């Protein structure tokens, strides 16, 4: 535990935001942009992604020669602030739209939701259809999934607890995986 805290403190000095920090409701939200083009692809992370900017990099780097790319790191993700506020879908959507606006990224968008953000993308398209040109799902969740979803909360909390203690540092299979080494799983 002590080693983890020392390493974490040293690592914090190495971290610099990869995107622009914009103010949303009094807190900083990270928005990364890259590329040019007539269409803007907005990558939307699911739950449990530490850094959406890095998580999507192997994909958006292949697209940024032809399209504008935007990655919004929701509160609690990446370089965005951690907030103790309601995380309902209306709040999250409002914050995402505000962050894009403050970063100067105008609709219409091609939404690229991963996992749980699929619901946010569908809701966005229903509520603001003029802002959504298309949705390209990246293994996205759909409403029917929630009827059958069975999240093992104790296992999830155990994982969070182990990460907080630094136990994941002792798992070389995670730190030395191909995805971590190269940023992608395949050529």
Q: Where are these predicted regions, by residue range?
A:
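Conserved hydrolase catalytic core segment
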Residues: 106-150
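Gram-positive cell-envelope targeting signals
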Residues: 1-6, 73, 111, 139
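Conserved catalytic-core motifs of eukaryotic protein kinase domains, centered on the activation segment
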Residues: 53-55, 80-86, 147-148
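Alpha/beta-hydrolase fold catalytic core
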Residues: 1-41, 64-67, 101, 106
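Conserved HGGG/HGGXW glycine-rich cap/lid loop of the alpha/beta-hydrolase fold
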Residues: 27-79
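Active-site loop/oxyanion-hole signature of alpha/beta-hydrolase fold enzymes
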Residues: 74-112
